[in-house]
Each structure stands twice: as C-alpha cells, then as structure tokens.
A protein has these predicted regions:
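ADP-ribose/NAD+-binding catalytic cleft of ART/PARP-like enzymes
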Residues: 1-70, 212-214
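Intrinsic-disorder/low-complexity regions
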Residues: 1-3, 8-9, 19, 27-30, ...
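ADP-ribosyltransferase catalytic core
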Residues: 11, 32, 58-128
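Short, flexible beta-strand-to-coil junctions
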Residues: 35-42, 94-99, 155
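Intrinsically disordered, low-complexity, compositionally biased regions/tails
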Residues: 42, 48-50, 76, 117, ...
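Active-site-proximal loop/hinge segments that shape catalytic or ion-binding/gating pockets
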Residues: 108-176
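Charged, long alpha-helical assembly modules
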Residues: 169-216
Length: 216
C-alpha cells in the first residue's frame, strides 16, 4: 500500500445487490487478502488455486451488475476479513494483475469486504492463528451483528481468545438477545433448521456458556 491516507472508507457506497468497479488508484491503495482451506475453494466446484501464478476464471459476468451472479474470485481486506475467517485455515496475500477487472460487491454483513476479480494471484500462504484473528479483530470495521457471527466463526475455528474478546467487548444488556440468536444461528449445521446444544464443540460451548452465565 502507498503511504497516503486512502482506505476502504473512501470507497463509494455499493447499491443493494449491485457492484462497483474499482479504479486503478483504488486497487493500488488497498491491501487485499484471502482465506481458504489449503489452496482449494470450498465454493462451487472446489477450484484449486495456483500459488504465485495468475489464476483466471471463465465464470465472469460483470455485465449482470449483480453481486451474486458476477462470478470470479472473491477476496477481502484486513478490516473485513474477521467475518470470513470461518471459511478457511490458510491466509494469502492477493495480487491483482494489471489487466484484471476488480469489483466491490455489495455485502450487508461486511460492506467493502467482498471483492471479486476475473484474475488473481495468491501468495505468502500462512496458517491462520488465534493471534492473527485477534489482530484482525482489532483492525475490524464491521456492522454490530457481524461481530456476533464472527465470534461464532472464531470459536468454530478454534480462535477462542478472539471469540472471548469479541464477547466481552460487544455483548451487552441491550443487544444480548440478538447476539445470542446470531451466535446460535451460526452454529446450526447446513441441512438443519433449529439450534441444539448437540451441535456445540468444546470451543463453541465456551462461548455458549458465557451467554448462559451473562448477568442481564
């Protein structure tokens, strides 16, 4: 990133369900990162990324101007990645080739936190740790409800200290019910409709018990 004061807060608001194309200046002044399991995407057909090489997709439809239909490769920034840490165990730096098209995609849970491109280079793979998660939390800029989801995600991934920190910082008497609801909803496995304590593991139960013991 250059030494000026440009940040994600300078990006134009993305309209609902829509996308905004980034300028070269914006691309060059943001630090992009990506998290996934190993070098494979769990979305779609399980695309395996090449490291330090250009990855290019045929599934690219910016003409739709639709955040859900644009396709391409997704990635984020440090201020937003906390929301997506549940989706992987390995963090990568993202480099955009000079001829890549890059779009900021509307995301209510992480505004200016979902970017997509037709071409991407990933580099510098490193395992995500609790310490890294804590660092991302300290840098994070997210809507309140997203912190409750991120708290659940961190507990699922084993970043317990970060999850506890989020709980202590963000959960209070006025938002307790929504926080507990968001946490439980995030724990429910795919294919199930309602929460059960049977879905809790050792780490998620620690946060669950903090809710049960919270003095309202």
């Amino acid at each position: 990133m250059n030494s000026n004061k440009f940040s994600i807060n300078n990006l134009k608001e993305v309209e609902k369900y829509s996308i905004n194309k980034l300028t070269e200046y914006e691309i060059n002044n943001l630090n992009f990162i990506k998290v996934m399991f190993g070098n494979s995407s769990k979305a779609g057909n399980g695309f395996e990324y090449k490291i330090d090489e250009i990855n290019e997709t045929d599934n690219w439809h910016p003409e739709t101007k639709d955040a859900k239909r644009i396709g391409g490769f997704n990635f984020s920034v440090e201020e937003k990645i906390l929301r997506w840490l549940v989706r992987g165990d390995t963090l990568y730096d993202v480099i955009l080739p000079n001829d890549a098209d890059v779009y900021d995609c509307e995301s209510p849970s992480a505004p200016h936190g979902v970017f997509r491109s037709n071409k991407i280079i990933i580099s510098n793979p490193r395992p995500v740790t609790d310490e890294m998660a804590m660092n991302f939390y300290n840098k994070s800029i997210l809507p309140e409800k997203s912190y409750f989801k991120a708290m659940a995600g961190c507990s699922i991934r084993g970043y317990v200290n970060t999850a506890i920190k989020i709980f202590n910082d963000k959960v209070n008497k006025s938002n307790f019910e929504i926080a507990f609801s968001e946490f439980k909803d995030f724990i429910i496995p795919n294919g199930e409709d309602t929460f059960s304590e049977d879905y809790l593991g050792n780490n998620t139960r620690k946060i669950y018990d903090m809710f049960l013991n919270f003095e309202k």
